[in-house]
Amino acid sequence: MKKIFRTLCAALALTVCLCLPAFAQEAIPAQPAAKEDKVVTDLTGRDAFLRDVKGFTTNFGGPYVFAQADHKSPAEPYGAAPAEGSVATLRIYTMSDDKGDASINASGHAFVSVTNVSDRDINVGGLLIAPGKAVTIGTRGNRSEHSGIWYDLESYYMYYIPDYYYHLYAMQTSLDAGQLEVLNRGLRRADHWSACYNCSAFSEAVWNSVCADALSAGRPASPANLQADMLAKYSDKTAYEPPIPYDYAVYYGCALTPSREFA
């Protein structure tokens, strides 16, 4: 009987471990981007429209819930040196031209990136990012593999299709270890997307949780609104069409599943 009990306990413990979300487990090293010599294309015309319609009508995620850091950093000019004591730089990007993201007005895309400015690996969403390396983070509802949070998908597109995100604007702020933890806690609850709570709502929530200079994506949220607010408030801190590094493979979801489609 004791042997059976021990066996059942062991099986239960194994099941619990397997079912733990990625953020409850030890962070994993992000795998370097393959950067294969290949031609990558995306849907256009009617096919892109139908993909957006499907995303618009089949995803119903709610608001992005990010706690507010107990201290917030000011916005900085894009490319500025990180503030003293920082471990990372957070950048927010937005473009208002339609490129297939099914947001409420089907126009544009918004996302963020985190760059490691420390001398050791940092945990971003469960991925270990090496010093000097960066990862992009965004949400989408119109990709067949997954609806929700994606890591380095934007980097993948910009590497293989350099004009994929054109007329892109960006600004940045610095993160210390405590602010990075606030961001990570929010990412654990951000694996969803909907027409109202879309990529721009996600980017706004991330930014405002740690930056004292707030941005608004409007209501309903859209990349166009986010871009307009960024340029109206902080035009002296924005960069136009900044480079997007492609350091790591593409992952999606809280389970950090490596993408097959975007490998």
Map each language-model feature to its residues.
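Bacterial N-terminal signal peptides
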Residues: 11-19
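Second-shell loop/turn segments in exported
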Residues: 97-101, 166-172, 185-194
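Glycine-rich catalytic cores of cysteine/serine-nucleophile enzymes that process amide/ester linkages
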Residues: 49-167
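A short, structured loop/turn motif at beta-sheet edges
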Residues: 173-179
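Ser/Thr- (and often Asn-) enriched beta-sheet segments in non-cytosolic proteins
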Residues: 39, 87-91, 174
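Sec-dependent signal peptide cleavage junction
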Residues: 18-32
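Bacterial N-terminal signal peptides that target proteins for export
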Residues: 1-9
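Activation targets extended, charge/polar-rich intrinsically disordered C-terminal tails
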Residues: 25-28, 37-65, 181-263
